[in-house]
């Protein structure tokens, strides 16, 4: 393990349009090669599509989607007596949002729609309706944790 100090967490500034730190983190997650402007136009374009499709506030739909994606439990490998056990642990709040955003963007990139704006909008809409691949990923994670509940006493 490294002996150096842990790097301090940088404060994320809320985005100018929705005044939300979560939206800023989504933009940062979508961003490739430092092209923040492109990433912002993708996210805001997706939010416009969501507003058109639902008639509701896009930020509320996005927050609902994130609640449906973020995992509560996950499994972590723990070595005990020469064998590895998948030990279920609770997910810290910061990691919950990080995992949720990561899964959302990764799965949106794998979708079949023509543009990233369409893919992201459709995946957020699916997640807000408790369907879609990102929600399935969370369910699979929870299922793994539930299946390995017998090893919960190995928690550290």
UniProtKB/Swiss-Prot annotation:
Q: What Pfam families is this protein classified in? A: Ribosomal_S7 (PF00177)
A Gene Ontology cellular-component term: small ribosomal subunit
* Keyword RNA-binding annotated: yes
According to the UniProt entry, its GO molecular function terms are: rRNA binding; structural constituent of ribosome; tRNA binding
The organism's superkingdom is given as Bacteria
Concerning SUPFAM superfamilies, the annotation shows: Ribosomal protein S7
GO BP, one annotated term: translation
Instruction: Locate the transmembrane regions by residue number.
Output: none
Supply the alphabetized keyword list. Ribonucleoprotein, Ribosomal protein, RNA-binding, rRNA-binding, tRNA-binding
Tell me the HAMAP family matching this sequence: Ribosomal_uS7_B (MF_00480_B)
Q: Which family does it belong to?
A: Belongs to the universal ribosomal protein uS7 family.
Under the heading PANTHER family, the entry gives: RIBOSOMAL PROTEIN S7 (PTHR11205)
- Describe its function: One of the primary rRNA binding proteins, it binds directly to 16S rRNA where it nucleates assembly of the head domain of the 30S subunit. Is located at the subunit interface close to the decoding center, probably blocks exit of the E-site tRNA.
Instruction: Indicate the quaternary assembly.
Output: Part of the 30S ribosomal subunit. Contacts proteins S9 and S11.
Q: What is this protein called?
A: Small ribosomal subunit protein uS7
């Amino acid at each position: 393990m490294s002996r150096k100090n842990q790097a301090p967490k940088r404060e994320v500034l809320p985005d100018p349009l929705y005044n939300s730190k979560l939206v800023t983190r989504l933009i940062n997650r979508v961003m490739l090669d430092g092209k923040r402007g492109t990433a912002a136009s993708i996210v805001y374009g997706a939010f416009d599509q969501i507003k058109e499709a639902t008639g509701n506030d896009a930020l509320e739909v996005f927050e609902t989607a994130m609640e449906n994606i973020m995992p509560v439990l996950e499994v972590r490998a723990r070595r005990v007596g020469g064998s590895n056990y998948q030990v279920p642990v609770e997910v810290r709040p910061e990691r919950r949002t990080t995992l949720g955003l990561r899964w959302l963007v990764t799965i949106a990139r794998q979708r079949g729609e023509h543009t990233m704006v369409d893919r992201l909008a459709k995946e957020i809409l699916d997640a807000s309706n408790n369907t879609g691949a990102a929600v399935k990923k969370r369910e699979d994670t929870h299922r793994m944790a539930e299946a390995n509940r017998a090893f919960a006493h190995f928690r550290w």
